[in-house]
């Protein structure tokens, strides 16, 4: 079989990143970097069932019996529901359509499924790292290499950091590596290291002689983002309690043509003509292709490139037939 049909969400990663950056802007305006009041007045509290029994998150029991821990999480719940509610709703809608895939990929890589919502808070990293060129759902600073378990590229025509499947595998590899470096009971310190840097976290652990996220004073942005991630997860699991009503979102799907080898360069515009679709829609389904050079090249130098091309649901077979008729397909396809 030269192609396979894979159920994947068309999450339009560019749109997701715009939403994410909106959350960052709101946070910048609504969360002044000052010490919280010791006696906060909040509108939204933690659900009773969360407080009633030990709350385990990403392999770690959160010490909610401590008032300071409750405050840090409750403050972020109120921030999301009061200051960032519209963006929160959009993120939960996106999670409805693509969350299943992220959880599936993370589980396969041995990473807790709570990380499926971690991407929503990552734009907060950008504030303190303006010189770093982040990209994709997981805000990867650079593509993974072969020794990290997944080989990715960022070249003239593609950036694999924008591919949801490759990027998630890359993120999983890196978060597992960070966990082995910073230790800790669960995964919170690894997440903090992903946000704030492993060196800073290890230095803080040595300085404070602890591996507990809740016991070590960390940079405010790091503390807020991890608490926001937990808050977002609690809200998602208790939508009725927080009066969050989201119409059921059907998983958006696309098909993948795997192992495609071309006789000549194939442009996004040509694919759009074959399928009778706007070129913008085809590009959104293939987000790793760069908009300033929107092609699937037949060769890079003298090397034949093997492609995975994504189409809307029900269009995979049509595109294969059109490519055959137009003489785009090499006789020996990688999938055969």
What is the meaning of each model-derived region?
Residues 11-22:
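Bacterial N-terminal signal peptides
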Residues 25-110:
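An acidic, Gly/Ser/Thr/Pro-rich helix-cap/linker signature
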Residues 78-92, 102-108, 126-135, 153-166, ...:
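Second-shell loop/turn segments in exported
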Residues 111-127, 190-196, 282-285:
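Short, functionally critical alpha-helical segments immediately adjacent to catalytic or ligand/cofactor-binding
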Residues 133-155, 168-171, 175, 203:
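Substrate-binding/active-site groove segments that recognize
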Residues 136, 218, 281, 285-335:
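Extracellular LysM carbohydrate-binding repeats and other cell-envelope/extracellular binding modules
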Residues 172-206:
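Catalytic and binding regions of secreted/periplasmic enzymes and modules that target cell-wall glycans
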Residues 247-276, 334-336:
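Primarily a LysM-type cell-wall glycan-binding module
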């Amino acid at each position: 079989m030269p192609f396979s049909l894979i159920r994947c969400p068309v999450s339009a990663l560019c749109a997701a990143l715009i939403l994410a950056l909106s959350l960052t802007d709101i946070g910048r305006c609504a969360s002044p970097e000052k010490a919280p009041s010791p006696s906060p007045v909040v509108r939204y509290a933690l659900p009773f069932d969360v407080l009633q029994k030990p709350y385990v998150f990403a392999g770690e029991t959160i010490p909610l019996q401590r008032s300071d821990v409750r405050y840090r999480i409750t403050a972020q719940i109120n921030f999301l529901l009061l200051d960032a509610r519209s963006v929160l709703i959009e993120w939960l809608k996106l999670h409805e359509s693509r969350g299943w895939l992220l959880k599936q990929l993370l589980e396969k890589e041995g990473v807790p499924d709570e990380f499926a919502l971690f991407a929503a808070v990552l734009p907060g990293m950008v504030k303190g790292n303006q010189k770093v060129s982040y990209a994709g759902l997981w805000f990867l600073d650079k593509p993974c290499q072969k020794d990290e378990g997944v080989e990715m590229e960022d070249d003239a025509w593609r950036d694999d950091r924008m591919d949801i499947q490759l990027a998630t595998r890359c993120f999983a590899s890196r978060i597992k590596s960070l966990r082995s470096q910073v230790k800790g009971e669960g995964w919170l310190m690894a997440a903090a290291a992903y946000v704030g840097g492993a060196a800073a976290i290890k230095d803080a652990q040595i300085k404070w002689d602890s591996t507990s996220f809740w016991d070590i004073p960390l940079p405010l942005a790091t503390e807020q983002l991890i608490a926001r991630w937990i808050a977002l997860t609690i809200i998602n699991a208790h939508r009725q309690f927080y009066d969050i009503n989201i119409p059921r979102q059907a998983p958006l799907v696309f098909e993948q043509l795997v192992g495609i080898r071309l006789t000549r360069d194939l442009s996004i515009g040509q694919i759009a003509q074959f399928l009778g679709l706007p070129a913008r829609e085809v590009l959104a389904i293939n987000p790793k292709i760069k908009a300033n050079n929107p092609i699937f090249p037949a060769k890079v130098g003298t090397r034949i490139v093997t492609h995975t091309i994504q189409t809307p649901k029900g269009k995979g077979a049509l595109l294969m037939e059109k490519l055959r008729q137009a003489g785009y397909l090499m006789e020996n396809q990688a999938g055969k």
